[in-house]
Amino acid sequence: MLRCLISRPQLLPTRLPLATPSCVSRRTFLGFTGGDTKEQRYILKRVFNAPLHYVYPAVSEVSLYKLFIPYCTDSFVNKRRPGDNMPTEAGLRVGFQQYDETFVCRVDCTTLPGNQRSVVAESLAHHLFETLHTQWLLSPHPTRPDASVVELILRFKFKSQLYNSVSSIFGTRVTQVVMKAFEKRVFQLRKEAMDRPPTGDAGH
């Protein structure tokens, strides 16, 4: 779902994945072409101490990214799928100092065999990126019913050589920061659910 994924002028250690393009910037370096720079690829896998029914909503609901992803100043959903209300087009606005970028992506949220979930975000515009692909693969932990395996796959190439150079330095760190932000978000959602008073006749 989400062309979520994650995100701004990719030049600071904290925002890359879930995101999509549609650039509105106070300052950019799009005049510097990307040359022969290769597409960058990052893969990160973690175990979250929460079942999928907490993880999947955190990843798929792009409109709430602004609440927990560093430097994400806005997040929104333009289109949703009839029936389950999952996002099909979403975006992020990321700002840091004089940089301000907005990204819009096509989002695809699907259920896979083995009770897995997939959230894929692909860029819709190409004035900032040559390519941008973000995928979250969410799986039940094979031996721990109360845990999930979360894998983030990120592929991108900027049109700006400067952005490509800077992101090649910070890419690994950015991916880790994004993953950590989602882990904290899932922990928060689970804690809120556990702290919520039971419904029904519990007070009688």
From Swiss-Prot:
Pfam families: Polyketide_cyc (PF03364)
Feature: transit peptide: 1-24
GO-annotated molecular function: molecular carrier activity; ubiquinone binding
Presence of the UniProt keyword Transit peptide in the record: yes
Membrane topology recorded in Swiss-Prot or TrEMBL: Peripheral membrane protein
InterPro entries referenced in this protein's UniProt entry, alphabetically: COQ10-like (IPR044996), COQ10_START (IPR005031), START-like_dom_sf (IPR023393)
The name this protein goes by in its record: Coenzyme Q-binding protein COQ10, mitochondrial
Organism: Eremothecium gossypii (strain ATCC 10895 / CBS 109.51 / FGSC 9923 / NRRL Y-1056) (Yeast)
Subcellular location: Mitochondrion inner membrane
Source organism phylogeny: Eukaryota, Fungi, Dikarya, Ascomycota, Saccharomycotina
Function according to Swiss-Prot or TrEMBL: Required for the function of coenzyme Q in the respiratory chain. May serve as a chaperone or may be involved in the transport of Q6 from its site of synthesis to the catalytic sites of the respiratory complexes.
Keyword terms, alphabetized: Membrane, Mitochondrion, Mitochondrion inner membrane, Transit peptide
